[in-house]
Amino acid sequence: MAYTTGQTWGALRKTWKAYRIAKVQNNSGDMRKYAERIRSLQAELGVAQAKFPDLNLV
């Protein structure tokens, strides 16, 4: 099922929020999962991908 651009932006916003929560909780496993999802959603939207050097995602 394909998602609309608006739905993808909404998912990106929620994923960033989840990433920030995981970072505060110092949960590196969840941080990596959300960082990968953020980069995937950004690629889908055609915007610059965020870099996460502390997670080796550049």
Name each region found by the language model.
Residues 6-58:
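Short, charge-rich amphipathic interface segments used for partner binding and complex assembly
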Residues 1-5:
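A ubiquitous short alpha-helical element
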